[in-house]
Amino acid sequence: MIAGLKGLKLPKDPRSSVTRTATDWAYAAGWMAVRALPEFAVRNAFDTGARYFARHGGPEQLRKNLARVLGVPPAAVPDPLMCASLESYGRYWREVFRLPTINHRKLARQLDRVIGGLDHLDAALAAGLGAVLALPHSGNWDMAGMWLVQRHGTFTTVAERLKPESLYQRFIDYRESLGFEVLPLSGGERPPFEVLSERLRNNRVVCLMAERDLTRTGVEVDFFGEPTRMPVGPAKLAVETGAALLPTHCWFEGRGWGFQVYPALDCTSGDVAAITQALADRFAQNIAAHPADWHMLQPQWLADLSESRRAQLRSR
């Protein structure tokens, strides 16, 4: 689904091509190692790493983000939650590296028992206008996408271009191997919004990660009591095509998974900002219920941006 790499700290300096290449190699090595080793060994290694980072305070931005969810100062975020959050984040990557080698049909049958709210998706497709599934970066959204392909066929999503191009292509190939249709956010033959609209008008499913867009194109919303910006794409697609906008959430349940599709948001007003706020409210409820599984290691709120960055947003 869109991006899926929000926690990465990839270099932006064009002179750092060596570092970018090393990053690509590191992910390639991780992919091979995780597939080659027994599951219990990989799980223990990832969990040990999570506990180590948690004991040393964990990523500062993750702590700040969880503080907003809990409504406490960053220093008051419980250490067990930090540890659980890092373990959840590591589990996501562990499963990403293994997912292409797993029997998808067998796994989909297992997931059939834990996915709720499918009647909302079925109703949307029965109406013939398509469906937009909007999700935050929580749990394992790639696993949910794999299930969707097995039960409803290929869906369409969008991916940000990473650098180096080889790393970007590695993740595109990975998601296409799961049956996703992945459009580049930039540099494609056609604008992604145009293609997504076309897919919806053909009664297809579009899936978008939708809780963060700290750019001038994002719309300002209230999120856990503070202002941030979220992408307008999901709401705009629903308004312009008539597709159902279905908030969706993924989380982990023990060693299993939880997935829930929620009722379609009311988009009849055509007010993209108001619809996006309603989506933000739904996300907030779901993230608060499963805070450890929200994998947001980058700044989420405007207050965490530099003053110069905030000034750029205000100059729109």
Curated annotation (Swiss-Prot):
The entry's keywords: Acyltransferase, Cell inner membrane, Cell membrane, Lipid biosynthesis, Lipid metabolism, Membrane, Phospholipid biosynthesis, Phospholipid metabolism, Transferase, Virulence
Any one Gene Ontology cellular component term annotated for this protein: membrane
Chief localisation class: membrane
Pathway given in the UniProt record: Phospholipid metabolism; phosphatidylinositol metabolism
Catalytic activity: a 2,6-O-bis(alpha-D-mannopyranosyl)-1-phosphatidyl-1D-myo-inositol + an acyl-CoA = a 2-O-(alpha-D-mannosyl)-6-O-(6-O-acyl-alpha-D-mannosyl)-1-phosphatidyl-1D-myo-inositol + CoA; a 1,2-diacyl-sn-glycero-3-phospho-[alpha-D-mannopyranosyl-(1<->6)-D-myo-inositol] + an acyl-CoA = a 1,2-diacyl-sn-glycero-3-phospho-[alpha-D-6-acyl-mannopyranosyl-(1<->6)-D-myo-inositol] + CoA
A GO molecular-function annotation: acyltransferase activity
Active site positions: H137 (proton acceptor), E211
Protein's GO biological process: glycolipid biosynthetic process; phosphatidylinositol metabolic process; phospholipid biosynthetic process
Keyword hit for Cell cycle: no
Annotated hexadecanoyl-CoA binding sites: H137, R175, E240
Superkingdom: Bacteria
Record's subcellular location: Cell inner membrane
Disruption phenotype: Essential, gene silencing is bactericidal. Depletion of PatA causes a block in the biosynthesis of PIMs, resulting in severe changes in the composition of the mycobacterial cell wall membrane, which correlates with the loss of viability.
Entry's EC annotation: 2.3.1.265
Pfam families: Lip_A_acyltrans
Membrane topology designation: Peripheral membrane protein
Family: Belongs to the LpxL/LpxM/LpxP family.
Purpose: Catalyzes the transfer of a palmitoyl moiety from palmitoyl-CoA to the 6-position of the mannose ring linked to the 2-position of myo-inositol in phosphatidyl-myo-inositol monomannoside (PIM1) or dimannoside (PIM2). Essential for growth and survival in axenic cultures and during macrophage infection and in a mouse model of infection.
Name of the protein this chain belongs to: Phosphatidylinositol mannoside acyltransferase
Organism expressing this protein natively: Mycobacterium tuberculosis (strain ATCC 25618 / H37Rv)
Lineage: Bacteria, Bacillati, Actinomycetota, Actinomycetes, Mycobacteriales
